[in-house]
Structures are given as structure tokens and as C-alpha cells.
Amino acid sequence: MKGRSLNAEDRARLEAAIGYQFAEKERLDRALTHSSARSGRAINYQRLEFLGDRILGLCVAELLFQTFSDANEGELSVRLNQLVSAESCAKVADELSLHEFIRTGSDVKKITGKHMMNVRADVVESLIAAIYLDGGLEAARRFVLEHWTHRAASADGARRDAKTELQEWAHARFGVAPKYRTEDRSGPDHDPRFTVTVEVDGIDPETGVDRSKRGAEQVAAMKLLEREGVWQKRSAGN
């Protein structure tokens, strides 16, 4: 969807998909508006995304705390990072077909595809914030539980911290320590994207992207461990 707002039919279809009816329809429009859709009032989802990220983290942390009563802080953190990642949020967006409703400028060709994963993830967080502002925390929590409870149950929390695992594996296999290098930092200050490369002498490097430097390091380490067969690669449904 390009610059136009939702019509009544589209709004009803989307509200049915997400299981929530907005009292203030403008909140839903804002949550779906990418910064490239330059309207006269320059309304977009960036501020909502900032809030939605925190609400999602709270609701998922609460879910994990209640579900995995025997898990320690480290395991809970691993599970949390998996569940609130851009990849997980983008999968929720795809399940809801949000790409059909996102408002963009004419210079944005398409929202689908891996290279636009962050946009779809951002819209999910913005949608959570819009629901929170319109209906309160309980409404936002219901949405999160609907789409994250089964993910929490299937998340591979048994995995250790990826950087720790890679450190020990690289030392045992090659007698060296991994080296991490920050390749790029992009995005606005409130929502940065870090690109980090991890190198282990003797094998090809891997690159990770995340909203924090540490997160990007973890993603890069995880990808290398999966590529080398140290960790089993997670299925697309998890």
C-alpha cells in the first residue's frame, strides 16, 4: 500500500486479523505509516515503535518468567532475545499480512523480502504501542500473548550464550579466540542498527545485524555456530 490511508474495508479486515478494534482510528493509521510516506503532517510510526519495543519486551519477559519457573536469568535472557528479535517480529507481521497495509512512499518498491524485514518488524512494535495507547496494557498484552505464547514454548532456550559457546568452540578447535569488528551503524539514534562481523582464524567470517552492538555480536556468533554445525539451525517456524 502506498501513501493512502486505510479505507473502511481494509481497516475492518486488519482489525479482524489482529483481534482488536481501535476507538481512535488515527492510531492504527500512524502505526502503519513508514517515514517514506511524506504526508503534510509528517506522521509516521517511529515514536510508536520506540514505545512498542518496550511494551513487547515487558510482556514477553513476563510470559517467560511465568512459563519457565526453573530457568535462570541467563536462559531467560537468551529466550527473550530470540523472541523479541526483528526476525520474530517480522514473522508475526507476515502471519498478519501487514505488508498489505503498510503506507510507504513511492520510492519504496515493496515491503516483502528479507531486506525489508526490519520495516515489518518495526510495524509490529508500532502496532503493539498503538493498541496499548488505545486500549491499555491488558489489550496490548492479549495481542502479545496471542502471537508469542507458542513461540515462547518452542524457543530454544537450552542454547547457551552464543558468544560464550563460540569462544569455547574456537579455542578447542583452532586454539584461537573469536574477533568481533563493528562494520556499520545506521538508523536514527532511538532505533540504531549495528552490523558486526565475527572472525575465527581458519574459517570464513559471519555477519550479524541487531539493534545493539552486543545483540549483533550474538547474532553473528549464532550464525557461525549454526553454519559450522555446532548448533542445529532453528526451523522457520520457531
Swiss-Prot record:
Compositional bias annotation for Basic and acidic residues: 180-193
One Gene Ontology biological process: mRNA processing
Class of this enzyme: hydrolase
Coiled-coil stretches noted in the UniProt entry, renumbered to this chain: none
Needed cofactors: Mg(2+)
S-S bridge residues: none
InterPro entries registered for this protein in UniProt: dsRBD_dom (IPR014720), RNase_III (IPR011907), RNase_III_dom (IPR000999), RNase_III_sf (IPR036389)
Active site: 53, 125
PROSITE patterns xrefs: DS_RBD, RNASE_3_1, RNASE_3_2
Region of interest (Disordered), ranges: 180-215
Domain RNase III: 11-136
Broad class of where this protein is predominantly found: cytoplasm
SMART domains membership: DSRM, RIBOc
Enzyme Commission no: 3.1.26.3
GO molecular function terms listed in the Swiss-Prot or TrEMBL record: double-stranded RNA binding; metal ion binding; ribonuclease III activity; rRNA binding
One Pfam family it belongs to: dsrm
Top-level taxon of the source organism: Bacteria
Locations listed in the record: Cytoplasm
Catalytic activity: Endonucleolytic cleavage to 5'-phosphomonoester
DRBM domain: residues covered: 161-230
HAMAP family membership: RNase_III (MF_00104)
Quaternary assembly: Homodimer.
Family under the similarity heading: Belongs to the ribonuclease III family.
Protein name (record): Ribonuclease 3
Source organism of this protein record: Sinorhizobium medicae (strain WSM419)
